[in-house]
Regions:
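Asp-box/WD-like beta-propeller blade repeats and closely related beta-sheet repeat scaffolds
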Residues: 115-126, 133, 149-184, 190
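Aromatic (Trp/Tyr) and acidic
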Residues: 1-87, 91, 119-143, 183-204, ...
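Solenoidal tandem-repeat scaffolds enriched in leucines and small polar residues
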Residues: 163-236, 243-248, 254
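C-terminal beta-rich recognition modules with glycine/proline-rich loops and embedded aromatic residues
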Residues: 209, 280, 342-350, 355-442, ...
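Helix-terminus loop motifs that line ligand-binding clefts
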Residues: 37, 73, 87-120, 150, ...
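Helix-capping and short linker residues that terminate individual alpha-solenoid repeat units
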Residues: 85, 101-105, 144, 160-164, ...
Length: 623
């Protein structure tokens, strides 16, 4: 079995979560997961295939991802219901599982398509089954729902009977004529099949997983059209530094690559074979060091491509961010290294939550660094990925590091931790993080106890200090854990000060401002005069020039309160609007266009995108 340096807290260990993360968590609960029409539609998609009078008119025959929706909903709802102590949502989960089980066919098939349109599946059904299995297994694990486990087992049997290495079975990667999709992402099914073996104790699933893994190289070589994932040998080469990510497969799909890495992580957790762990950690480290944006997002319109094809206006998808966060959490659990929690923080407080509408009702599929986010739409892979991670956000705040209590991320919150050989411990954060780096941590063991308290210090918090009660402040190591070992008394308190300086990411012509954990953006619709007449825009972010020195960006910035409904603080910066392009045919017409004008601009954390929307720019010109 795998070695772990950090153990996650259970969702029921989270007593409360507030602040910005809490607002987004509660919005996801109220306006997404508890939307009665949305959840109902997800399960009805599965039920319709068993109703012959509906099969010709109302079953789903397109190639893409709607069959996954119920799985991601179950996953998110189970975590959320336990964190929020929401009995009504727990009841709904049980009802959905019962209806899913009733919709399952005799051979174990659990999808949304009638038999005559499957060859062996419709479109992306292995991708869809990945999430259906995950949702069922989460409910079996967290809620002890045995019907969920049995339904997952029957689906798992269908999968390992239909695909595999034996005569008469389909390859996981191959040409499936007429199914409407290239069939190139099948290796991703590895993770939930391994997890199914863990939970059932049935060794057939692990044996199937390792046997099919041994065929990845051959299957991918025989199917060059697949650009979703890559062969096993190439994964080893990437982890070792012998290939770059865009060389794994031309136009490789970021999300599927991450999902396949999660499968190798599950194999390591089950078998303890170091090779699997080395591939995952090597890949995560290279992606973090070389391919993740400073907002935490990654890829260009879903794909890892050579760097010359990246641009701030390129689309950045939610899906690979959600599996990236899961990979980072896995690396954090294995190693206990603060860097992985820092990367989770980077993505959550910037690009990931920038894609969520502030009311929690939906997510943008794509959210570029500059331009405008794609208008949220009906159920799709990305808004379901968003609510899946949002449903478990609070579980990333705390953990046990070397069996000692640890604070991994900062947000107003409270959790009860049960560490081996220690009394029950309540940790409560009072803070306005990420707007402020001032945190009061209440440390409240049920009785006096000696233990080490681990506090993660972010890499940007130079000069961080911690003060226990009235003791002298102690300096804290930047980018690592501060470990405070002492006898803790009920009612103890630690004051943690994390300095937030204003820095920038800049080249010779463009820059982006950063304050502490937050990347900032210029939102046209958040300016005092957005220059909008009905649906006509007279000004865009690319018209803005900031008057800043990138060597000392903080000197040209003034902090002020943001509007009440927005994450702050706002940054007020002096700059100018460039002269308009001479678009009219005559000099007289062009003379009436606005001339260059100096003025103040208001920049806000990028995470406000789902509240402000419209045109924005993370990168702005400067002089």
């Amino acid at each position: 079995m795998a070695r772990r340096s950090i153990s996650s807290v259970l969702p029921q260990d989270i007593a409360s979560v507030g602040g910005f993360l809490g607002q987004r968590f509660q919005a996801n609960l109220k306006n997404r997961l508890k939307d009665p029409l949305l959840g109902e539609e997800f399960v009805r998609l599965h039920e319709r295939k068993r109703q012959p009078f509906l099969q010709w008119t109302r079953t789903y025959d397109d190639w893409f991802w709607l069959g996954e929706q119920v799985g991601k909903w179950l996953d998110a709802a189970a975590y959320t219901a336990l964190i929020a102590d929401d009995q009504a949502l727990l009841n709904k989960i049980n009802q959905v599982i019962e209806r899913l089980a009733q919709s399952q066919e005799e051979d174990g098939y659990l999808g949304i398509t009638v038999r005559w349109h499957r060859n062996p599946v419709r479109g992306m059904e292995l991708y869809e089954m990945y999430y259906v299995l995950h949702g069922l297994l989460v409910c079996a694990d967290l809620l002890d729902n045995q019907l969920a486990l049995e339904t997952a087992r029957r689906l798992g049997d269908y999968i390992i009977r239909t695909w595999g290495t034996e005569s008469g079975q389909f390859p996981l990667v191959g040409r499936f004529p007429g199914n409407g999709h290239d069939g190139g992402e099948g290796t991703l099914i590895l993770e939930p099949i391994v997890l199914l073996g863990q939970q059932t104790g049935d060794e057939r699933y692990l044996a199937w997983s390792e046997k099919t893994l041994g065929m990845w190289d051959k299957w991918l070589a025989a199917y060059p059209e697949s650009t979703h994932t890559c062969d096993y040998t190439s994964m080893k080469q990437f982890a070792a530094g012998d290939k770059d990510v865009y060389e794994l497969r031309e136009n490789i799909h970021a999300h599927t690559f991450h999902m396949t890495l999660l499968g190798l992580a599950a194999l390591y957790n089950t078998t303890g074979k170091e090779e699997y762990r080395d591939i995952v950690l090597g890949s995560v480290d290279r992606l973090a060091d070389e391919w993740v944006f400073f907002t935490g997002g990654m890829s260009s319109t879903e794909r890892y491509v050579p760097r010359r094809f990246y641009h701030p206006r390129n689309q950045i998808e939610v899906c690979p961010q959600h599996t990236w966060i899961l990979l980072l959490d896995q690396a954090l659990q294995w190693t206990g290294q603060a860097r992985y929690a820092a990367e989770i923080e980077r993505d959550l407080f910037n690009h990931f939550l920038a894609a969520q509408l502030a009311d929690g009702s939906n997510w943008s599929y794509f959210t570029p660094l500059n331009g405008h986010a794609q208008e949220p739409m009906g159920p799709n892979c990305c808004n379901a990925a968003g609510h899946r991670i949002a449903g478990r956000l609070p579980t990333y705040l705390y953990g046990l590091r070397g069996n000692a209590p640890a604070v991994l991320l900062y947000s107003a919150s409270e959790a009860v931790l049960d560490a081996p050989d220690l009394p029950s411990l309540t940790l409560r954060q009072e803070t306005n993080f990420p707007s402020s780096g001032e945190i009061i941590l209440h440390v409240d063991p049920a009785q006096p106890a000696d233990f080490a308290l681990h506090l993660r210090i972010p890499p940007y918090a130079d000069g961080a200090t911690a003060q226990i009660g009235s003791d002298q402040p102690i300096s804290a190591p930047t980018g690592d854990f501060l470990v405070i070992e002492r006898e803790w008394q009920p009612g103890d308190m630690v004051k943690l000060s994390l300095p937030f300086s204003v820095t920038c990411q800049a080249n010779d012509t463009q820059l982006a401002l950063v304050r502490g954990p937050l990347v900032y953006a210029y939102f046209q619709d958040a300016q005092p005069d957005p220059v909008v007449f009905h649906y006509h825009r007279g000004q865009y972010p690319e018209d803005v020039n900031l008057h800043l020195d990138p060597a000392q960006p903080g000197q040209g910035v003034r902090e002020e309160a943001a509007a009440e409904e927005l994450l702050g603080p706002a940054l007020r910066v002096r700059g100018s609007i460039q002269t308009r392009a001479p678009i009219f045919a005559t000099a007289e017409g062009n003379a009436q266009l606005p001339a260059q004008e100096e003025k103040d601009f208001v920049l806000l954390p990028f995470a406000n995108q789902g509240a402000v929307q419209g045109e924005y720019g993370v990168f702005l010109k400067y002089r």
